Amino acid sequence: MFYILLTYLVSPVLYLLLFFRQRDDVKKILIIQTAKIGDLICSTPVFREIKKNYPDASLSAMVNSSTRGLLENNPNTDEIITIKHADYKGLKGKLRLSSLIRRGKYDIGICLNPNIPFALALFWGLVPIRLSVMPDFSGFTF
């Protein structure tokens, strides 16, 4: 809840910065999937379809260190970013994560985890086009 409130407070500044970052062509795409092995296996068709629709774009995947091996030989991923959840806990960790995303200068960010801090990190990381799976806190995800 704290991260949502913080996002509302700084969103005018972030929207202004996003206005200056928008580009017409898509060069870099980030997919965040830091869940378990089964979730990553089920989301590999997403990588294929994105690469099919954006063949010239560089596709990066942000995954756990335990699931990195599943994507190492995947022809649809150009870069694999390995993260540890312990390194990104707390406000400092979330700011470090958004800084990592900002340095990547991604045009599209897709968060496949129903995890609010990762979805907000795309906004804090100044990704112009953001897609995310959001939980509704009643046990269902939409």
Question: For the regions a protein language model found, what residue spans apply to each?
Answer:
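Catalytic machinery of carbohydrate-active enzymes
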Residues: 1-142
